[in-house]
Structure formats: C-alpha cells, structure tokens
C-alpha cells in the first residue's frame, strides 16, 4: 500500500513538471510587431568612406523589425505647397533577403543620395539613388530650376512604431526664395513647405 502511495505521488510530480515545461516553451503572445528607425551619421563609421560618392543631399538610417517580417515599401512622394501631389517612385519588399543568404537579418540600412545634373539638352534633372543593402535603385525626376535653396528633413532620434500606419523617414525640401527653414515631419511643418521629396515607409496589410 505504501509503495502504491509513492507511485501516485511520483506521477503527480512528473505531471506537474511536464506542465511547467510546456508553459515555459509556450510562445509569448504579448510580443507585438514593431519597427525601430535609427538615424545614421554618414560622416562616422563604415559609411564615411561612401561620402565622396554621394550627392550633396544625402542621409541614412537603419530599420529593424521585431516580430513578424513586415511587407514594407519605401515610397517617394512629391509635395507642393504643403500637400502631396504626386508619386515619384517606390521600392517594394524593403526587407528582402537574397535566397540562400546565411544571415537572414531583421535589420537593413537605407542610404539615400539626391543630386541634380544637367542633361545633354541642358535640362536640369534630379537623380535619386537608394541603397537598401540588398540592392541599389536609381530614379530620375524632372527638376524645377527655379528651386534654388535646398535642405534636408531627417529624424534625429531613434523611433519605434508599429507597422500599421505610414511613417515619414527622410525628405529633401526646396524653395524658390533661397531661404531654407528648419523643419520636421509634423503636419504643421509639412504644411509650410513649397516643394519636397518625402520618403515614406508604408506597409501592406
């Protein structure tokens, strides 16, 4: 009878340990998908050696996702007099990793370079180059030669957000008055710009 009691107690202990183990490996459902944007100083670190090859208006930032890999695109939007008026291009599947890549990283570094050049027809055009780590894209845009003053709008601090709404990441604004004002990505700041090329992170549902 005493042996039977020991067997019952042992089974209770074993069952409890199994339950605890199952609970320990259960995925944490409280973790939410998020993306962190970290500004990169092009004058520091590894990117400094690229500086001579970049346009006069350049910037960089890192994007790191936590949770499920998002379906994200980096869109170029043209703004005039405080409102979006057109789309200038887009890079889809921003977190793409080449097939067979050993280190399937959840972080990418985006480098954007903007410059203007004159064509053989003596027309000024804008050249936009975007590197995402897995590839390099180049876009050519018409340019209004009356826009003389130019400036950059960048995030200066690390941001963390959820992939359920568009986020402005970088912009170059220009003015015909030759007066460039400091600004940010708030609605109030964007409403005051004469012209801008705004890079916006968007997510597919």
Spans of model-derived segments:
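Sec-dependent signal peptide recognition
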Residues: 2-9
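C-terminal motif of bacterial Sec signal peptides marking the signal peptidase cleavage site
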Residues: 13-16
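Extracytoplasmic electrostatic interaction patches
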Residues: 89-205
């Amino acid at each position: 009878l005493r042996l039977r009691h020991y067997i019952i107690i042992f089974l209770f202990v074993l069952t409890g340990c199994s339950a605890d183990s199952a609970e320990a490996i259960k995925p944490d459902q409280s973790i939410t998908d998020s993306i962190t944007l970290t500004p990169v100083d092009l004058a520091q670190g590894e990117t400094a050696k690229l500086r001579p090859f970049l346009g006069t208006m350049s910037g960089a930032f890192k994007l790191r996702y936590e949770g499920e890999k998002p379906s994200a695109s980096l869109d170029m939007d043209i703004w005039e007099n405080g409102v979006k008026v057109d789309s200038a291009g887009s890079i889809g599947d921003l977190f793409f990793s080449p097939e067979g890549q050993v280190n399937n990283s959840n972080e990418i570094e985006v480098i954007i370079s903007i410059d203007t050049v004159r064509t053989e027809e003596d027309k000024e055009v804008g050249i936009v180059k975007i590197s995402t780590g897995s590839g390099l894209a180049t876009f050519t845009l018409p340019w209004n030669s009356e826009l003389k003053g130019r400036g950059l709008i960048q995030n200066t601090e690390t941001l963390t957000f959820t992939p359920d709404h568009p986020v402005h990441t970088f912009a170059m604004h220009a003015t015909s008055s030759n007066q460039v004002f400091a600004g940010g990505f708030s609605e109030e700041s964007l409403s005051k710009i004469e012209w801008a090329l705004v890079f916006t992170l968007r997510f597919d549902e």
